[in-house]
Each structure stands twice: as C-alpha cells, then as structure tokens.
C-alpha cells in the first residue's frame, strides 16, 4: 500500500489541520453557561430586585449643608412632609455610614476638596444629589470663589432645580421617582468584590424630555391670577 506524505504549510490554508485558527474566550466558560441558563438568569434577576428593593427603601442621607437649600432639605423631615414614610429619615453623622449625600447650597472653591474627600469616604453603593441652582451650576454667583456646578468634581445622579427648591421637590427627586427608580434598575455584584465592581446603571431620562410631549399638548393655559 502506497503512502503519500503531505507537508503542512503553516502559512497556508489547511482544512484538515487548522493550525492558525485560534479562538479567544473571554471570561470563565462555565460561568457564562450558568448565566445563559433560563433558571439561573431568573433567579439572579430576582435576587437583584430583592437587594435593590431593600437599598432604595432604606436610604440614609449624610447630614451636612452648605447654604439656604439645606433648610428646605431638613424641612422634609418635619411632620408635615414626613420623609420617614420612605425610610430616608436616618441622618448619618459619618460618611462611612451614609448611602447618599445631598450637596445643598453654594459650593465654594475652598469647600470643594472637603466635599470630595467626604464622598471618597462613603462606602459603595453611594449616590449624589445636587440640590438647588447654586449646586447645579453656581446659580447667581458667577465668581471665582464659587464652583460652577458640583458635577465638576463629583458624579451627580440627580439634579434638583430651584432657588431654593421646595421640600416636595427634594422628596420627588429622592424617593418618589428619580433616585429610587435608578437604584431599582442597577445591577452590581451580590458578593464581596475586590477592585472593579462592574456596576451597571441605567441611563436616566431628564424630566424635561420625559414631560415634553405632555406639556406641548396643553392648549388651555391657566390665567396668572390662578397660579
């Protein structure tokens, strides 16, 4: 019986021996298979929803204020508004025990490093609310000593407009709509994690865009004496 030897060309195309064909797999294949499972996917999603439900209904604010907007913030803790109904009445004196911080008032240049250090001392998960025109964009203080928006050095999650905003605006931003809705859609590791946490946060639609169609559809406007 005759045998024929065929030399394999490493640089050529070889159907039988694809020496140059390599597949790069990112991550653990077993873990990817588990996450692709319908049962495990639903179970993991249910665990995320349960953990986020606890987080969004027990938000502990860090207690500090910068200006007059802080007065409107603490007004929501009175019996008239009763922010305790939503589990956010536990004021923390230490940033290590707080879930979110509210920058309420005018942020001066000398105060910015202090606020940034307090934010870095907060443990994950943590959120930031910018309350009032001064915190959002500097307000009427277009001057060298005032930071033109705290988002220059902090990742802001929710902006509250107004000069100053009413307590109802603070409660709407914190509890009734914006921050709780954002926390409910987050996906972060459910176990101890060292290093990058891989947090997924859904994009929040601005209230101006969300209510644009409703406001444009209004044809009968109220008279000024009814406002």
From Swiss-Prot:
Q: Quick one: which residues bind [4Fe-4S] cluster?
A: 68-69, 134, 163
Q: Name one GO biological process term.
A: aerobic respiration
The cofactor note from the UniProt entry for this protein is: Binds 1 [4Fe-4S] cluster.
Against InterPro entries, the record matches this protein to:
NADH_UbQ_OxRdtase-like_20kDa, NADH_UQ_OxRdtase_20Kd_su
Q: Which reaction does it catalyse?
A: a quinone + NADH + 5 H(+)(in) = a quinol + NAD(+) + 4 H(+)(out)
One GO cellular component term: respiratory chain complex I
Q: Which molecular function GO terms apply here?
A: 4 iron, 4 sulfur cluster binding; iron ion binding; NADH dehydrogenase (ubiquinone) activity; NADH:ubiquinone reductase (non-electrogenic) activity; quinone binding
List the EC numbers from the record.
7.1.1.-
Topological relation to the membrane, as annotated: Peripheral membrane protein
Q: Which residues form a coiled coil?
A: none
Q: Which cofactor does it need?
A: [4Fe-4S] cluster
Transmembrane stretches, start-end: none
**Subcellular localization:** Cell inner membrane
How is the quaternary structure described?
A: NDH-1 is composed of 13 different subunits. Subunits NuoB, CD, E, F, and G constitute the peripheral sector of the complex.
> What family is this protein classified in?
Belongs to the complex I 20 kDa subunit family.
Listed PANTHER family: NADH DEHYDROGENASE, NADH DEHYDROGENASE [UBIQUINONE] IRON-SULFUR PROTEIN 7, MITOCHONDRIAL
Q: What is the name of this protein?
A: NADH-quinone oxidoreductase subunit B
Q: Specify the species.
A: Yersinia pseudotuberculosis serotype O:1b (strain IP 31758)
